[in-house]
Amino acid sequence: MDLSAVRFDEKGLVPVVVQDARTGEVLTLAYANREALEETLRTRRSTFFSRSRQALWRKGETSGHTQEVVEVLLDCDGDAVVYRVLPQGPACHTGERTCFHRALLEGAKDLGFVPRQVYATITARLRPPPE
């Protein structure tokens, strides 16, 4: 696990975009320090660094809404990471599926029928529920 290409900021953090691996939907933006990133890669569970608590934050530790990490990507500059995940429940502490549920742009276009999302939903429902 070579993290030498990751450019952590002056506080030792890197932003992490969390994306649903099935739908491509952005679920949240969080931060990871080296320890959180190492734990994520080792356990394949989303782990972050809580800036408010100054401690590791393991997604789902209290809510049960875990995220299985299927891929971790580093951007071209090395200063941002994407966790592609299979979420078990909502990503947001409010109970919303995504933390990005408040529209700032009025009258945003409805994309209507999105075959990729329909396929992902059907595929997910065909799988047996987690034990």
Residue positions per predicted region:
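C-terminal binding/interaction regions
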Residues: 2-13, 19-22, 26-27, 32-131
